[in-house]
């Protein structure tokens, strides 16, 4: 799962529509056309100060029309980017061919350097961690801890790293170190998920399997917003730190954390033993820290823009909507009828039916 996230993850920023000729209804302002002298207002809205954004809004109004205060306009003026926007006409075939080549090369290197027991270091790494205590629960927690330190640590050093070696080189370094650790953790969990002590047994209870399946299906819609910028993940396009605001972000500001918690609870309920509980404990703790660290990094990068989005979003799903801080547009459903979400749907169904293949491949590694 974590491997899939690292391989997957650019949509253009959202433009805003002009208001009606009369006194504007700010609840309807969503797009501002590009000014002929300013060029594309997208980058200005996503990176400029609140004063510049107000000037852009003023350009769509008559001179005698007042501009609402930040508190009045913040629920409607989109500062961040439109998540999951994908325009097929703007895609370049050469970029996706390059993406396929990069993916193939990465998987080949990963197999030689880490996966293949005759040439790679994966088994030696797993054995070293397992021999620390001999307990599968401790080994599971240790693997997650190592991955979390490397993954979150490198993410925290992103600004410094990109200045030193560039965005693309840092992305390659980040993925090159994180990917083997993530795969080791996943394979160990698959191979040892039924070790440890059984805490409960619900697999024979009617309706439990169906409920678990639905929970896992829903979790993937939260887990992988990174599919919004696939070409950046592979460093085909220059990687950027995005400030998403629409789609799943309206429900929760940290969809990966929510998705991981749902996934962990579902699998722990189904497996019902100490190894699954240990894995869930480690993964949830890592994502809770990641949510805090992510907010910290976005606040440092975007300043007031992030604070404005933070005020009208929530960490707890639907909280901002119920509290009235997030006002959903009438056509909100259209933010989900997009290719990335359709791809997630297909991949989630495919992953379910591919479980026997994943389990067989993991078992053959003897990790």
Swiss-Prot record:
InterPro entries: NnrU_dom (IPR009915). GO terms for molecular function: 9,15,9'-tri-cis-zeta-carotene isomerase activity. It catalyses: 9,9',15-tri-cis-zeta-carotene = 9,9'-di-cis-zeta-carotene. The keyword ATP-binding does not apply. Keywords: Chloroplast, Isomerase, Membrane, Plastid, Transit peptide, Transmembrane, Transmembrane helix. The chain crosses the membrane at residues 95-115, 137-157, 172-192, 211-231, 269-289, 339-359. This is 15-cis-zeta-carotene isomerase, chloroplastic. It comes from Arabidopsis thaliana (Mouse-ear cress). The lineage of its organism: Eukaryota, Viridiplantae, Streptophyta, Embryophyta, Tracheophyta.
């Amino acid at each position: 799962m974590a491997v899939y996230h690292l391989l997957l993850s650019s949509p253009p920023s959202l433009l805003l529509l002009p208001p009606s000729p009369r006194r504007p209804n700010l609840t309807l302002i969503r797009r501002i056309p590009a000014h002929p002298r300013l060029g594309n207002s997208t980058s200005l809205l996503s990176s400029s100060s609140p004063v510049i954004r107000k000037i852009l809004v003023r350009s769509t109004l008559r001179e005698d029309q007042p501009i609402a205060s930040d508190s009045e306009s913040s629920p409607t003026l989109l500062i961040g980017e439109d998540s999951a926007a994908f325009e097929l006409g703007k895609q370049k075939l050469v970029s996706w061919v390059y993406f396929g080549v990069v993916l193939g090369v990465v998987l080949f290197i990963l197999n030689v350097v880490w996966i293949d027991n005759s040439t790679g270091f994966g088994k030696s790494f797993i054995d070293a961690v397992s021999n620390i205590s001999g307990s599968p629960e401790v080994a599971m927690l240790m693997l997650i801890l190592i991955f979390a330190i490397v993954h979150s640590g490198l993410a925290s050093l992103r600004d410094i790293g990109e200045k030193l070696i560039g965005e693309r080189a840092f992305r390659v370094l980040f993925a090159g170190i994180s990917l083997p650790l993530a795969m080791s953790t996943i394979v160990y969990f698959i191979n040892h998920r039924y070790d440890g002590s059984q805490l409960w047994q619900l697999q024979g209870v009617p309706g439990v399997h169906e409920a678990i399946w639905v929970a896992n299906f829903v979790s993937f819609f939260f887990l992988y917003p990174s599919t919004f910028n696939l070409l950046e993940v592979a460093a085909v396009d220059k990687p950027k730190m995005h400030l998403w605001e629409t789609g799943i972000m309206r429900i929760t500001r940290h969809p990966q954390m929510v998705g991981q918690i749902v996934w962990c609870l579902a699998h722990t309920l189904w497996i019902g033993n100490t190894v699954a509980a240990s894995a869930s404990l480690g993964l949830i703790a890592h994502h809770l820290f990641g949510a805090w660290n992510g907010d910290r990094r976005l606040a440092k990068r975007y300043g007031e823009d992030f604070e404005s989005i933070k005020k009208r979003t929530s960490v707890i799903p639907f909280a901002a909507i119920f509290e009235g801080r997030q006002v959903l547009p009438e056509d909100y459903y259209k933010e989900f009828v997009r290719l990335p979400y359709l791809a997630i749907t297909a991949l989630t169904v495919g992953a379910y039916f591919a479980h026997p293949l994943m389990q067989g491949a993991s078992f053959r590694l003897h990790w």
